[in-house]
Regions:
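Short cysteine-rich clusters marking metal-coordination/redox-active sites
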Residues: 147-150, 171-174
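Short linker/helix segments within small regulatory modules
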Residues: 158-168
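Residues immediately within or flanking Cys/His clusters that coordinate Zn2+
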Residues: 141-144, 168
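Short metal-binding segments enriched for Cys and/or His
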Residues: 175-191
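Short, non-ligating residues that shape and space the ligands of small metal-coordination modules
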Residues: 153-157, 180-181
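Short terminal alpha-helical segments
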Residues: 1-32, 128-132
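Short, charged early-sequence alpha-helical segments and their helix-coil boundaries
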Residues: 37-63
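Charged, low-complexity interaction regions
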Residues: 12-20, 35-37, 52-56, 114-122
Length: 200
């Protein structure tokens, strides 16, 4: 099974068939897809200027999509290194019980679904790297009341999401499943109440 970097080389290789280059970009999403596979693909296609079903996209657009994905991946991998170092130090200092951020991080190790978008057509407009920087920044500060990706104030509690956790606060503006550790208890309660008002 090819790794992310090997697949990225195939996307860039002009000697490869265009279908293989597109396929390799899709396979990269099996290794790293911050919004989930389908939503990340839709995001990359719209930002690079080709359709999700386009079987013959301009090779330069494929490479542009890959570059955005690679930048986001490097942001996330740097965060994971810092996270691992912090946990190692905490364990050395006797803190064996992980906190809520650590529980959330366990579910997103490797970067899959870090900013899960249940509807593949609804996702942030900004670059993947920028969204991840905002998310990481939110994880490293005190909890707030808005979406860390877009500063959206309208969060609604959704059930039966195609992700773990399968319930949680979803931003109605950018569509991400907002990590619970970045929200105050009041913001979480408001999101739940919003769900009750919507379903009533």
């Amino acid at each position: 099974m090819a790794g992310f970097r090997s697949l990225a080389r195939q996307v860039r290789d002009p000697r490869c068939d265009l279908a293989l280059r597109r396929y390799s970009l899709r396979k990269c999403l099996e290794r790293f897809a911050p919004y989930g596979h389908r939503a990340t693909w839709d995001h990359l296609c719209s930002r690079a200027g080709f359709g999700p079903e386009d079987r013959s996209p301009d090779p330069a657009r494929l490479v542009a999509a890959l570059e955005e994905l690679e930048e986001a991946r490097s942001v996330w991998l740097a965060y994971e290194v810092e996270f691992a170092e912090r946990r190692k130090k905490e364990k050395h200092d006797g803190l064996r019980r992980p906190g809520s951020v650590d529980d959330w991080h366990r579910l997103t190790w490797g970067g899959f679904g870090v900013a899960w978008c249940d509807d593949p057509r609804v996702h942030p407009d900004e670059s993947l790297a920028e969204v991840l920087r905002r998310l990481i920044s939110a994880l490293e500060r005190e909890p707030g009341a808005v979406c860390p990706a877009c500063d959206g104030e309208r969060l609604v509690w959704k059930y039966e999401l195609d992700h773990e956790p399968s319930t949680g606060p979803v931003c109605t503006e950018c569509g991400i499943l907002v990590p619970r550790p970045v929200l105050t208890p009041e913001a979480l309660a408001d999101a739940r109440r919003g769900r009750l008002l919507v379903s009533a």
